[in-house]
Amino acid sequence: MTNYPQLNKEIQDNEIKVAMHTNKGDMTFKLFPDIAPKTVENFVTHAKNGYYDGITFHRVINDFMIQGGDPTATGMGGESIYGGSFEDEFSLEAFNLYGALSMANAGPNTNGSQFFVVQMKEVPESMVNQLVDGGWPEPIAKAYADNGGTPWLDQKHTVFGQLIEGEATLEDIANTKVGAQDKPVHDVVIESIDVEDK
């Protein structure tokens, strides 16, 4: 049976728990090293080294996603721990459901340090029907129907984690006032990211 780790909030032995502290509250995620090993290692190493500390969510689109992880706050910056961009790690077990932690990119295999959290609360019914026809697994299509998400990003952005606590913080950030290029008028800052060691 295929495992869809995003469909439950329990942290399994093969998952990593991280707490993201922002100036608008905390968000807790579980990461999937079995599904996206290089992506998770990149994120965890950056988190432990303080790379993300003080970085903002530079692009916020309510009812779509919040994006951060760029030290330049322009959407053009950031690098991976591997010294350049690295390859996508797509899976048929992880999807861009509401609350998914996913890599931002500039096309195939251009992952660096930027990530986003999916915040779209409703997938149109017509699209949900297309998902089942298009080969999306039934439990995932149901999760999209029930909770929302951005299915058109599947197999285009690496999903490597899922929000398990702090939905109110995600919503608060998403509802922040933005100016040009969807940049928040008042900085939304990632103060630190704690990685829970097993």
From Swiss-Prot:
InterPro entries tied to this protein: Cyclophilin-like_dom_sf (IPR029000), Cyclophilin-type_PPIase (IPR024936), Cyclophilin-type_PPIase_dom (IPR002130), Cyclophilin_A-like (IPR044666)
Intrachain disulfide bonds: none
SUPFAM superfamilies: Cyclophilin-like
Reactions that this protein is recorded to catalyse: [protein]-peptidylproline (omega=180) = [protein]-peptidylproline (omega=0)
Gene Ontology MF annotations: peptidyl-prolyl cis-trans isomerase activity
Entries under Gene3D superfamilies matching the protein: Cyclophilin-like
The protein's Enzyme Commission number: 5.2.1.8
Annotated ranges, domain PPIase cyclophilin-type: 14-195
Keywords attached to this entry: Isomerase, Rotamase
Function as written in the Swiss-Prot or TrEMBL entry: PPIases accelerate the folding of proteins. It catalyzes the cis-trans isomerization of proline imidic peptide bonds in oligopeptides.
Family recorded in the similarity comment: Belongs to the cyclophilin-type PPIase family.
Protein name (database record): Putative peptidyl-prolyl cis-trans isomerase
